[in-house]
């Protein structure tokens, strides 16, 4: 009898716990209306926080929130001593690691690519650095370098820069966060502005519109000054920090991010898109007049690289706009997920099915990748053409005694016929300040050859150009010989007569030389006579 009564009491206790205990603990808190005037002053007094939430007691809630701690807050203002982990729960730990690894790998490549471009177009390597287009490439490369530098700074720190501890997000008061945030913002803004300026300059070059050089300094100073303003304005409201969707510190306040980056970026994208379409139209007109379909191949690469940068910026802008419009929904899903964690912690595990609160890895991965491909796109567009090779071959780093002792960059022992003329033409084109993507040089060569009645495919290999030059020079020499033979032999085209004419020409030359020598002797005699007098 006693044993039956004992089991009956246990059954009542278990039934009461399963049916009444958990709703009373949480639901009464969530549905309660606190009599306190300030929301968030009512806490769930428990030291237990369901994973992955972390427990941290706070006696100064508002102060700790300003220091980067994100306490769990329910819709009715109820607070707990549980905080969100850093990095955020919008991605799994594996997803965060994947994105960080990709970022560091691609950023490292872009970092050294930007250094290569900076060296190539700097006064150290490039004697014709003081023109608008070269300054634009150099400045854009420096902006990309700054963007990638913030990732390189994370090689050892990884998540510790944005997450000083597993419970705290970095804010502007953290020196590393502020410095990297400023560098990243200035690099992004200046790179976008100079990229826009380069697209406009490319259009001016193709259409042969000359802009006064006095504006070069004005535009360089103006772009950097505007970039500095957009960089330091958010500092006023302490808007720099580490967010829920980032790998590094940037502007947290949406209004400041909108005014100091997204609106300028959208304006630059619209403007650059129009300019790119105008460039494509100009190139189309040139090739339509040439009646050669294959000639378009010489310009596909530079134009695709220019357009790819535009797509990269468009994706960054579009995805960020998508996150901004979905932010309220994402926060609601996170609140529902956290509520589900508390409910399951008070009941049997998995008693409640928690809603999906995470973002998909693919779009966010592509967002980070697009930013870090800027350096790769830059070196493809501006670092892989004949002009860059010429700059490096003539630079002090390559063209010196030490390198020349062990390496030779000459393709052969003999100098091709007409090489001087070709070098002179290339130098003149290079001094015209474009020569960076190769497109303008090819267009000008094409126009010149159309005027002369010679149409060839532009953008060919250097060897083909040399062979064509040699063939043209040989043809010119043969024509000259034929003309001489024709003049001396009354247009007789037989090979034997040509040889005889050559011999006659040689004899005539020898006779002329003898006459010149006799003349020189007579002159010397006259001079001596005068001296004697």
Swiss-Prot record:
Residues 501-528 form a coiled coil. Glycans are attached at residue 76. GO terms for cellular component: membrane. Residues 125-134, 199-216, 281-302, 382-533 are cytoplasmic. It is a multi-pass membrane protein. Residues 466-518 have a biased composition (Low complexity). Gene3D superfamilies: Rhodopsin 7-helix transmembrane proteins. Residues 1-21 form the signal peptide. Residues 519-533 have a biased composition (Polar residues). Keywords: Coiled coil, Glycoprotein, Membrane, Receptor, Signal, Transmembrane, Transmembrane helix. The chain crosses the membrane at residues 104-124, 135-155, 178-198, 217-237, 260-280, 303-323, 361-381. Its main location: membrane. The keyword Ribonucleoprotein does not apply. Residues 22-103, 156-177, 238-259, 324-360 are extracellular. It is found in: Membrane. Residues 454-533 are annotated as: Disordered. The keyword Membrane applies. Belongs to the G-protein coupled receptor Fz/Smo family. This is Frizzled/smoothened-like sans CRD protein H. It comes from Dictyostelium discoideum. The gene is fscH.
């Amino acid at each position: 009898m006693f044993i039956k009564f004992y089991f009956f009491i246990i059954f009542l206790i278990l039934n009461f716990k399963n049916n009444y205990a958990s709703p009373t603990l949480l639901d009464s808190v969530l549905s309660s209306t606190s009599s306190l005037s300030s929301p968030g002053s009512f806490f769930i007094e428990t030291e237990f926080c369901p994973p992955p939430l972390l427990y941290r007691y706070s006696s100064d809630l508002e102060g700790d929130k300003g220091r980067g701690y994100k306490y769990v807050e329910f819709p009715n203002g109820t607070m707990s001593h549980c905080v969100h982990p850093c990095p955020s729960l919008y991605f799994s730990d594996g997803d965060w690691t994947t994105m960080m690894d990709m970022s560091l790998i691609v950023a490292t490549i872009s970092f050294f690519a930007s250094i290569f471009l900076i060296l190539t177009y700097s006064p150290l390597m490039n004697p014709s650095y003081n023109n608008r287009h070269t300054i634009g490439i150099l400045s854009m490369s420096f902006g990309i370098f700054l963007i990638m530098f913030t990732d390189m700074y994370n090689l050892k720190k990884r998540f510790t820069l944005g997450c000083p501890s597993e419970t705290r997000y970095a804010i502007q008061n953290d020196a590393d966060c502020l410095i990297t945030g400023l560098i990243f913002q200035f690099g992004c803004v200046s790179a976008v502005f100079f990229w826009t300026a380069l697209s406009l300059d490319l259009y001016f070059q193709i259409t042969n519109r000359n802009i006064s050089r006095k504006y070069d300094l004005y535009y360089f100073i103006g772009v950097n000054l505007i970039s500095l303003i957009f960089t330091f304005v958010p500092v006023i409201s302490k808007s720099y920090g580490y967010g829920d969707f980032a790998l590094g510190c940037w502007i947290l306040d949406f209004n400041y991010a909108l005014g100091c980056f997204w609106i300028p970026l959208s304006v630059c994208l619209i403007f650059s898109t129009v300019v790119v379409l105008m460039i494509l139209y100009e190139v189309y007109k040139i090739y339509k007049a040439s009646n050669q379909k294959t000639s378009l191949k010489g310009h596909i690469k530079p134009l695709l690289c220019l357009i790819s940068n535009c797509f990269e910026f468009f994706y960054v802008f579009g995805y960020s706009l998508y996150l901004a419009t979905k932010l309220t929904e994402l926060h609601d899903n996170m609140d529902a997920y956290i509520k589900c964690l508390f409910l399951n912690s008070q009941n049997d595990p998995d008693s409640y099915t928690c809603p999906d609160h995470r973002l998909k890895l693919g779009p966010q991965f592509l967002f980070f990748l697009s930013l870090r491909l800027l350096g790769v796109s830059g070196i493809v567009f501006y670092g892989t053409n004949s002009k860059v090779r010429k700059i490096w071959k003539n630079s002090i780093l390559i063209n010196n005694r030490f390198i020349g002792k062990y390496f030779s960059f000459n393709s052969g022992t003999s100098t091709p016929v007409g090489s001087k003329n070709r070098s002179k033409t290339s130098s003149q084109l290079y001094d015209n300040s474009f020569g960076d993507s190769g497109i303008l040089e090819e267009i000008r060569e094409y126009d010149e050859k159309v005027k002369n009645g010679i149409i060839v495919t532009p953008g060919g290999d250097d060897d083909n150009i040399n062979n064509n030059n040699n063939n043209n020079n040989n043809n010119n020499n043969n024509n000259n010989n034929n003309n001489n033979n024709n003049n001396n032999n009354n247009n007789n085209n037989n090979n034997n007569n040509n040889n005889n004419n050559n011999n006659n020409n040689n004899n005539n030359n020898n006779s002329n030389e003898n006459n010149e020598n006799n003349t020189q002797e007579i002159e010397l005699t006259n001079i001596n006579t005068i001296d004697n007098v």
